Curated annotation (Swiss-Prot):
Similarity comment: Belongs to the insect chemoreceptor superfamily. Heteromeric odorant receptor channel (TC 1.A.69) family. Or1a subfamily.
Protein's UniProt name: Odorant receptor 45b
Keyword Cell membrane carried by entry: yes
Gene from which this protein is expressed: Or45b
Topology of the protein relative to the lipid bilayer: Multi-pass membrane protein
A Gene Ontology BP annotation from the UniProt entry: detection of chemical stimulus involved in sensory perception of smell
InterPro entries found in the cross-reference section: 7tm6_olfct_rcpt
Cytoplasmic topological domain residue ranges: 1-39, 95-135, 222-276, 323-369
Transmembrane segments: 40-60, 74-94, 136-156, 201-221, 277-297, 302-322, 370-390
Miscellaneous note of the record: The atypical heteromeric and topological design of the odorant receptors appears to be an insect-specific solution for odor recognition, making the OR/Orco complex an attractive target for the development of highly selective insect repellents to disrupt olfactory-mediated host-seeking behaviors of insect disease vectors. Odor-evoked OR currents are independent of known G-protein-coupled second messenger pathways.
Keyword Transmembrane: yes
A molecular function (GO) term: ionotropic olfactory receptor activity
Organism: Drosophila melanogaster
Length: 396
């Protein structure tokens, strides 16, 4: 038995921003719907839970920084991811109405393409939709496995020390008030700490899924524009005045839709620039500290950080892949126009084609401070983390 969204019979319309809606829905944040008091209270609890556990991780790491740097690193590594996720959760709630409006506009634009009854568009749409949902849920699943790995580590350590004096340790390296590390409150705070790991997973999977989904949905709309350019500029020998006029109108519609896509991407950049920048910076540090922890630890402790590193790397890869896919499809508009039979049309049509080619030379990208997410940026991030690890090895 596997999840319904993996089935080929699952309605295509439900795939649109599925990961974002599902992940944030688990936290009580609903986009485009009226927020009930129950959902709002659940959202506030999750936010406070994550903030409180971030503070507990920081206290643990700071208190062990001089006496046990290895344990301090074990606390600071998840803390970087948790604190970033806390920022993302607050940011997405603050911009929730803009996010909902953006989702509705994309739904309308894609709905216009669905009315075309074009097999090429249907195949491309299904391909992009399934990729967004499956890759987003892959990160969601990997994050849950990471939380499970930390919990299993904690339970295993309890089992190994069962004949010794019992240590009331949390699944993550957290230091609460003294009563939380004693019975009868210990089981409650143990679950409280574990849940903060899942809040982290749901929030970062929802935010990352929103970015990845948006870029691939835009890539689909740009691909649909490419099909329209190819259809509008089909080779016709001696086109009539009426045919030239129709072609010019179709090209004008293509330009308008291209402008609309660029406008939406600009608005999206305004919403996601801050969380994306913070994510890339923190992900670089998290990957580096995870690799350092792998070098410092031995035995079963390595497994959880291998999974953790793979999860964070997968999330940042989706950002970069989505940005590259969108910019590539944007550049392909100019290639499609140039490869068409534009030379057989009249002067006005050729002029419009020339303008499309010039416009397409400037790719559409999500603007983030200092960079635009792309596969070369992913390579740079990995190199940067490698430099941090090399520096840490010389110090440690």
């Amino acid at each position: 038995m596997y999840p319904r969204f993996l089935s080929r019979n699952y309605p295509l319309a439900k795939h649109l921003f599925f990961v974002t809606r599902y992940s944030f829905g688990l936290l009580g944040l609903r986009f485009g719907k009226e927020q009930s008091w129950l959902h709002l209270l659940w959202l506030v609890f999750n936010f406070v839970n994550l903030a409180h556990c971030c503070q507990a991780e920081f206290v643990f790491g700071w208190s062990h920084l001089r006496t046990s740097p290895v344990d301090a690193m074990d606390a600071f590594c998840p803390l970087a991811c948790s604190f970033t996720t806390l920022f993302k959760l607050g940011w997405m709630w603050w911009r929730r109405q803009e996010v909902a409006d953006l989702m509705d506009r994309i739904r309308l634009l894609i709905g216009e393409q669905e009315k075309r009854e074009d097999s090429r568009r249907k195949v491309a749409q299904r391909s992009y939709y399934l990729m967004v949902t499956r890759c987003g849920m892959l990160v969601f699943t990997l994050g849950s496995i990471t939380t499970g790995a930390f919990v299993l580590r904690s339970l295993w350590e309890m089992w190994v020390r069962r004949h010794q004096e019992f240590k009331f340790d949390m699944p993550f390296r957290m230091l609460f008030h003294d009563f939380a590390h004693r019975m009868p409150w210990f089981p409650v705070f143990y679950l409280y700490s574990t849940w903060s790991g899942q809040v982290t997973v749901y929030a970062f999977a929802g935010t990352d899924g929103f970015f990845f989904g948006f870029t691939l949905y835009m890539a689909f709309l740009l691909q649909a524009l490419r099909y329209d350019i190819q259809d509008a500029l089909k080779p016709i020998r001696d086109p009539s005045l009426r045919e030239s006029k129709i072609c010019c109108q179709r090209l004008a519609d293509i330009v308008d839709r291209h402008n609309e896509i660029e406008k939406i991407v600009k608005e999206f950049s305004g919403i996601m620039a801050a969380p994306t920048f913070v994510h890339f910076v923190s992900a670089s540090l998290v990957i580096a500290t995870s690799v350092i922890d792998i070098l410092l630890y031995s035995g079963y402790n390595i497994i959880r950080y291998v999974v953790y590193t793979f999860t964070v790397s997968s999330a940042i890869f989706l950002y970069c892949y989505g940005g590259t896919e969108m910019s590539t499809e944007s550049l392909s508009l100019g290639e499609a126009a140039y490869s068409s039979a534009w030379y057989t049309w009249d002067r006005e049509t050729r002029r419009r084609v020339f303008l499309i080619i010039l416009r397409a030379q400037r790719p559409i990208t999500v603007r983030v401070p200092f960079f635009a997410p792309s596969l070369p940026v992913f390579t740079s991030v990995i190199k940067f983390t490698g430099s941090i690890v090399a520096l840490a090895k010389t110090i440690l």
